[in-house]
From Swiss-Prot:
PANTHER family referenced in this protein's UniProt entry, alphabetically: L(+)-TARTRATE DEHYDRATASE SUBUNIT BETA
InterPro entries in the record: Fe-S_hydro-lyase_TtdB-typ_cat, Fe-S_hydroAse_TtdB_cat_sf
Species lineage: Bacteria, Pseudomonadati, Pseudomonadota, Gammaproteobacteria, Enterobacterales
Gene3D superfamilies (UniProt xref): Fe-S hydro-lyase, tartrate dehydratase beta-type, catalytic domain
Protein's gene: ttdB
Full protein name: L(+)-tartrate dehydratase subunit beta
Organism: Shigella sonnei (strain Ss046)
Active site residues according to the UniProt entry: H37
């Protein structure tokens, strides 16, 4: 059965979700990447949209005007780790509950997700056009002076996903755990290979 989160998301909605779970989002998803994070955390500029209980997407979309409305053409995730130095404070200050992006995030985001009850989730890379089909409407846009990729596009989405949980509210970090596991598996294999191919060195 599909696990669907609907905004506004509450802390109790997230307590039973664990890393490696697959979930979907219905409701409000706001594109929000480097400059937005810097403006809030470094420049202390308030975000012109209430993110409390909502979801953000580390993404720089392609949109087009259709009459008096905006239409999503393509919206793929950008590398979440670029926002690592800001994300803990960002979660604390905004009350955002779902951070969608590409790849994992680090210990600061882990701490933020655990302390302030949020999730980091991964949207599959290479599926930007598919993601755009899950955007029902662009309801608002803010900070357009930043250009299309960095503007805040407030989207209404339906069953947006699949989203793989990479950090949960209990401090678990799927990507960090996998790196350790892969290293443990890799080292003895590399040693064995080196015994047979030492002449290449």
């Amino acid at each position: 059965m599909k696990k669907i989160l609907t905004t506004p998301i509450k802390a109790e909605d997230l307590q039973d979700i664990r890393v490696d779970d697959v979930i979907y989002l219905t409701g409000t998803l706001v594109t929000c990447r480097d400059v937005c994070h810097r403006r809030l955390i470094e420049l202390k500029r308030p975000i012109p949209y209430d993110l409390n209980g909502k979801a953000i997407f580390h993404a720089g979309p392609i949109v087009r005007k259709n009459g008096d409305k905006w239409e999503m053409v393509s919206v793929g995730p950008t590398t979440s780790m670029r926002m690592e130095s800001f994300e803990r404070e960002f979660i604390e200050q905004t009350g955002v509950k779902l951070v969608v992006g590409k790849g994992g995030m680090g210990p600061l985001t882990e701490e933020g997700c655990q302390k302030f009850k949020a999730l980091h989730v991964i949207f599959p890379a290479g599926c930007a056009v598919l993601a755009a089909t899950q955007v029902e409407e662009i309801e608002e846009v803010h900070w357009t002076e930043l250009g299309m990729p960095e503007s805040l596009w407030v989207c209404r989405v339906k069953e947006f996903g699949p989203l793989i949980v990479s950090i949960d509210t209990h401090g678990n970090n799927l990507i960090a755990e996998n790196k350790k596991l892969f290293a443990e598996r890799r080292d003895p294999i590399v040693e064995e290979i080196c015994e047979h191919v030492h002449y290449i060195k």
